Amino acid sequence: FDYAGEHDLKSFEKGSHPIDGDRLFVNIVEYETTAPENRFWEAHRQYLDLHLMLDGTEQIDLNFIDNMVQKEFVEKDDFLPCEGEPNSHVVLTEGDFLICYPRDGHRTAVAAGGKSRMIKKAIFKIQI
């Protein structure tokens, strides 16, 4: 949170920006939200995700991975693909954040209210 408060993240270029080596870095992403059927579910084992909305509105669908079909973990990408349905969701607008723990399956880039829009977001990756 200190880093986010001390840096103008909106001015950061897309891509990965190191903060403390592999222990802590931030990925800046920009994309257009879409229908949920166009998106995928994921979870992570090695990092927490802290999603901080910089511009726009995005729905993130959520479910615990224990409620989902877990596919083969891709260790080099810290990527656990999952399949299932949401049991809840959050809508992030500018300044909002969401922390996803290893047991939290999440599907990002969902169009809130069915309305597609461009967003810019910082995703802090925090090694656990």
Enumerate the predicted regions with their spans.
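A short, N-terminal "cap"/entry segment at the start of jelly-roll beta-barrel domains
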Residues: 1-28, 35-43
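Short alpha-helix capping/helix-loop boundary micro-motifs
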Residues: 46, 82-87, 109-110
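Conserved metal-binding segment of the jelly-roll/cupin
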Residues: 91-111
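Non-DNA-binding regulatory cores of transcription-related proteins
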Residues: 72-86
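Glycine- and acidic-residue-biased ligand/ion/polar-headgroup-sensing regions
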Residues: 46-48, 52-60, 66-67, 75-79
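Short connector loops at helix/strand junctions that flank enzyme active sites
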Residues: 19-23, 43-47, 53-55, 93, ...
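A short hydrophobic beta-strand segment most commonly corresponding to one strand
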Residues: 50, 97-99, 115-128
